[in-house]
Amino acid sequence: MIVDGTKNATNDQFFNYKTATTYKALDINNCEFYGAVSGGTVMKGFYYVNVAATIEAVNIRNSYIHDITCDGGDMFDCRKGYMKTLNINNNIIYNCAKERDFVRYDDAAKSFNNPVPEINITNNTIDNCMNGVNGKRILYVRFNGKKAGQHIKMTNNLITNTQAVYTNQATTSTPEYSNNYYFNCTNANIFAPSDSGNSLYWNGDTSGRNGSDPKYKAPSKGDFTIGNEEVSKLKVGATR
């Protein structure tokens, strides 16, 4: 399914939860979603939860998501609800969240008896996101941060051309990092450990570093085939 947001009457998110109730899982698979950078509808974000809703899961898989500038909201944005599980898996995400955060999950935990949500971000190619200003966050996640926190995994992702950090929040749990690859990530704190004594809560991927250019085939056309054999053999990014 292809969802063209460029001619929407409003710039609301593609998915906007407006009723405080319990929802079954939202399962997005093998789709394309896009908005306009200019000359059309500039979307606020991908999803938005600003009510006390309980959502079993949000699964975003095997999809192309691009040109969602996030004018007025963050990319994956939950403010008052509780998503039990967020899975972002095997997607190509590019030209998004120009000056906004990637995953935002505010602390509404006390309304839901302080559960521990799971966030799994695996095998994605993320290019030119959070790249309009320095220091935006991949994980602006604070849900239940004053209690047991969150369970976050970042695995096998290819992250390129960004000025983002992972976080700068004391209430964001340190993710489990494994086999992520980076190129032209210009803010060194994306790799920095936390220093709670100095209130520097980077929670970065200390095993990561900027590597070689993956040499995408034709990124302007949405083709992120990896041309660098040394990067390709690491099995990072989306397999599309």
Where are these predicted regions, by residue range?
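Intrinsically disordered, low-complexity segments enriched in small/polar residues
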Residues: F15, G45-F46, I92, V103, ...
